[in-house]
A protein has these predicted regions:
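Nuclease catalytic cores that cleave nucleic-acid phosphodiester bonds
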Residues: 2-5, 9-124
């Protein structure tokens, strides 16, 4: 199973003060995804609106960004990734964004709620 994670949607699924330090929240999500992906042998791509400077990197998961930061740009990037996938039915998109869920679902991907993924990779 391939996972595509709507990064900021998953970060925002838990009101833990992430908005005070966006970079730390993104970095923490990446660390949690890395640990989970390596322990479960999952193929994970996390998508953000734009890269940070300096960029966040990982040797375990793929970190992707929209080509240009704009409203819904990460969503559009996720849809493009599902659309161009050889087997979209083998993709699980982690998001709670209703419009994004509808778009990727129409392409054959499965949607996994953001809060459920957050609880899976970072139990309270």
């Amino acid at each position: 199973m391939r996972w595509i994670v709507d990064g900021m949607n998953v970060v925002g699924s838990r009101p833990d003060g992430w908005w005070r330090n966006r970079r730390l929240a993104m970095s923490t999500l990446i660390e949690k995804l890395e640990h989970w992906a390596s322990s479960q042998s999952e193929d994970v791509t996390v998508v953000f609106e734009h890269p940070l400077s300096p960029p966040l990197e990982s040797s375990v998961i793929t970190i992707a960004h929209a080509p240009k930061a704009a409203a819904n740009s990460a969503d559009d990037q996720i849809v493009a990734m599902v659309r161009t996938a050889e087997n979209p039915q083998d993709i699980r998109v982690a998001t709670s964004d209703r419009m994004l869920s509808e778009r990727v679902g129409a392409l054959g991907a499965t949607v996994y709620p953001a809060q459920r993924l957050r609880d899976l990779i970072d139990p309270r």
